C-alpha cells in the first residue's frame, strides 16, 4: 500500500480525496518502519531495505524485551500463520529521524493480509497486541467518519505535540498529514 504525504498527490486526485471518508486515523510516529519476515524458518524484523544494520538492532532489542513480558516474535509468528504481516515503527534515540525520543519502543502500527491486502480491523489488532503484550499505535477515533478535508483542517489546527496522523480513507488510500507543530519543529532544527 502506497502512503502519500500531503503535497505528493496531484490536484485532480486531491479534489477527489478531499470528500473521502476517513476510516481509521492513527498517530504518525517518527522512526523506522519495520515488518515481520519469515526467513529460513525464523521470524525476523526487516526494514524496507531488507535485513539491514537497523533490522539487526531491532531484532536484538525485541529479543531482550521477552524477559520483560513482551513477545514480539510470538506476535509475528501468529500473524504469519494467518497469512498476514505486522508492521511496526521503531522509535527512540537510536532511530531518530527528526525528533529525539527518550524511550526506545517498537510500536505495532497495523496488520495486513498478504493475499487480499485487507487490513485487520482495529479490534483484532488491539487484541493481538494485548495478548502478546506489545504496544499499539494511538488511534484518533474523533477523526474517523469525517471527510479528509475536515480532518486535514483539524490536524493543522491541533496543538498536539505529535508528528501528525496517518489516515486510511474509504478508498483504501493512506495519507499522512503533519501537524503545524511538527512542521515548525522540523523547520527550526
Residue ranges and their predicted role:
Residues 1-189:
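Core nucleotide-handling region used for phosphoryl-transfer chemistry
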